[in-house]
UniProtKB/Swiss-Prot annotation:
The gene is dnaK. The modification Phosphothreonine is found at residue 174. Disulfide bonds: none annotated. It comes from the Bacteria. The lineage of its organism: Bacteria, Bacillati, Bacillota, Clostridia, Thermoanaerobacterales. PROSITE patterns: HSP70_1 (PS00297), HSP70_2 (PS00329), HSP70_3 (PS01036). Residues 571-607 are annotated as: Disordered. This is Chaperone protein DnaK. Induction: By stress conditions e.g. heat shock. Acts as a chaperone. NCBIfam families: PRK00290.1, prok_dnaK. The keyword rRNA processing does not apply.
Length: 607
């Protein structure tokens, strides 16, 4: 059975892991890193760059660089680059495709299946978009699991005692808090809450806003209008945030940040940890609301939590750790790597699916209530939030008017009392209802949530047996035809990438052969046969001319044409050197053998 890999598709960084020898291990990417920046760049020549190489060129190419695309999953947001439009699913698929390729290189075998993690508070549309991204990248997404749940798996797989844990997951762009009960291999989520628009990026933005304001005060120049300067500020802000986790003061020094009529301007500011915490105090407080909500939903007091797991790079900030410490009255657990534990948990779930990991049961929940719009614009819940999934629930409704021939089922997700305040997941019609006074027809509406948190809704007229159903893909979901088109484009790009890499290798080999040939000629020209020298020089010239053009087949041909003369030339040189090293007749060769026996005996004394 082929391997199923675990992927943490993050807002700022992504990570992948796999089960090896009964243990989940993080797989390094092609550059040797254990995490991959979730950044996609498009070079001026049209080449797609993903990961660290895309992040490195972002300063000089901000218009063609895409970051934090995860924040737009499940929306109709489009990225426009050089006249082309890309959906968040397509950009995410490019990141997943790189991870798939790197995993294949690490494992030495094809990777076609994956478990991908999402924030616990992701809506149905966002989950479906993640699944679509996997499909576009050529991966069969075997399971979508929640990030806090994955982190709990990574922490609790080898724990035997029963315990209640809280996962505090503050990533690059999203925040989740989940409460789980662990015991006898069962991981049961009791409650989850969160904020899909809160993460490390927001802390970076506060530093950026502060730098822009300070620089404007000093120089009168507004850097927010300069895209290249803003990209430099973004990198500097992230670096400052990271540094302030270990030092109390950091220097932000960006020479030649901009210029005016007087000449170039340099940016040099000091940011203290105290000032940073002042700038971000409200963001810290925003994490406490969902934390209180999850505790309330689980019916627990802070003292009943045995362990608090910190997940996501942003939890390294001292102010975050202090807020958690203050709320729960105890130190958070720091025994897991906040950047890698989610991918490790995804790999463990993959191991459960393949049978490599036994005696583990994962019981997750739906983060938001699901229901339909009823008379008066009211939101009627059919499945309450924090219900264990998979699950199915039914409720019977009736018509609102006499002789109503059809009903529109407006499917919603959220917690507000009125339909307008919640997110629309989809609409569909049940038609062919026989004429009858209002209140007589019986319409059974069934909600079915699978293990991935994907919703199916059906409506059935109990009188006629007629039914209609819909798999919710969200108003921004992609059709099968769109996904197929994107899959083909992704495959085509992968093929183009393979060809481009092959061309680079052919050119590199040809360059190396030219260098080797010219070096050999330079060292041995004087001792060589003039005809061989001439033949080799001509072959070198032909290959150099081929390298100036773009005809790869010609380069391959001329490389082969140079290999023969070079081998013949070096073989002749080797043979000549071997002959020169053989011993010739020495100076005593003509002497009589008897001369060697004419030894003179003599005494000597030491003086």
């Amino acid at each position: 059975m082929s391997k199923i890999i675990g992927i943490d598709l993050g807002t700022t960084n992504s990570c992948m892991a796999v089960m090896e020898g009964g243990e989940a291990v993080v797989m390094p990417n092609a550059e040797g890193g254990r995490t991959t920046p979730s950044v996609v760049g498009f070079s001026k020549t049209g080449e797609r760059l993903v990961g660290q190489v895309a992040k490195r060129q972002a300063i000089s190419n901000p218009e063609r660089t895409v970051t934090s695309i995860k924040r737009y999953m499940g929306t109709d947001h489009k990225v426009r680059i050089e006249g082309n439009e890309y959906t968040p699913q397509e950009i995410s698929a490019m990141i997943l495709q790189k991870m798939k390729t790197d995993a294949e290189a690490y494992l030495g075998s094809k990777v076609e299946r994956a478990v991908i993690t999402v924030p616990a508070y992701f809506s149905d549309a966002q989950r479906q978009a993640t699944k679509d991204a996997g499909r576009i990248a050529g991966l069969k997404v075997e399971r979508i699991i929640n990030e806090p749940t994955a982190a709990a798996l990574a922490y609790g797989l080898d724990k035997e005692e029963d315990q209640t844990i809280l996962v505090f997951d503050l990533g690059g762009g999203t925040f989740d808090v989940s409460i789980l009960e662990l015991g006898d291999g069962v991981f049961e989520v009791k409650a989850t809450s969160g904020n899909n628009r809160l993460g490390g990026d927001d802390f970076d933005q506060r530093i950026i806003d502060w730098i822009v304001a300070e620089f404007k005060k000093e120089s009168g120049i507004d850097l927010s209008r300069d895209r290249m300067a803003m990209q430099r500020l973004r990198e500097a802000a992230e670096k400052a945030k990271v540094e302030l986790s270990s030092v109390v003061n950091t220097n932000i020094n960006l020479p030649f940040i901009t210029a005016d009529a007087e000449g170039p301007k340099h940016l040099d500011l000091n940011l203290s940890r105290a000032k940073f915490e002042e700038l971000t105090a409200d963001l810290i407080e925003m994490t406490m609301g969902p934390t209180r909500q999850a505790m309330q939903d689980a019916g627990l007091e802070p003292k009943q939590i045995d362990k608090i797991l910190l997940v996501g790079g942003a939890t390294r900030m001292p102010s975050v750790q202090e807020a958690v410490r203050r709320f729960f009255g105890k130190e958070p657990h720091k025994g897991i790597n906040p950047d890698e534990c989610v991918a490790i948990g995804a790999a463990i779930q993959a191991g459960v699916l393949t049978g490599e990991v036994k005696d583990v049961v994962l019981l997750d929940v739906t983060p938001l209530s699901l229901g339909i719009e009823t008379l008066g614009g009211v939101f009627t819940k059919i499945i309450e939030r924090n219900t264990t999934i998979p699950t199915a629930r039914s409720q019977i409704f009736t018509t609102a008017a006499d002789n109503q021939p059809s009903v529109e089922i407006h499917v919603l997700q959220g917690e507000r009392q009125m339909a307008a305040g919640n997110k629309t997941l989809g609409r569909f019609n049940l038609v062919g209802i026989p004429p009858a006074p209002r209140g007589i027809p019986q319409i059974e509406v069934t909600f079915d949530i699978d293990v991935n948190g994907i919703v199916n809704v059906s409506a059935k007229d109990l009188g006629t047996g007629k039914s209609q159903s819909i798999t919710i893909t969200g108003s921004t979901g992609l059709s099968d035809a769109e996904i197929e088109r994107m899959v083909k484009e992704a495959e085509q790009y992968a093929e183009e990438d393979r060809k481009r890499r092959e061309e680079v290798e052919i050119r590199n080999n040809a360059d190396a052969l030219v260098y080797q040939s010219e070096k050999t000629l330079k060292e041995h020209r004087d001792q060589a046969d003039p005809n061989q020298v001439s033949e080799l020089e001509q072959a070198v010239d032909r290959l150099k001319k081929a390298l100036e053009g773009g005809d790869i087949e010609r380069i391959k041909r001329e490389t082969e044409n140079l290999t023969g003369p070079l081998h013949a030339f070096t073989a002749a040189m080797y043979q000549k050197q071997a002959q020169q090293q053989q011993p010739g007749p020495g100076p005593d060769a003509g002497k009589d053998k008897d001369d060697k026996d004419k030894t003179v005996d003599a005494d000597y004394e030491v003086k």
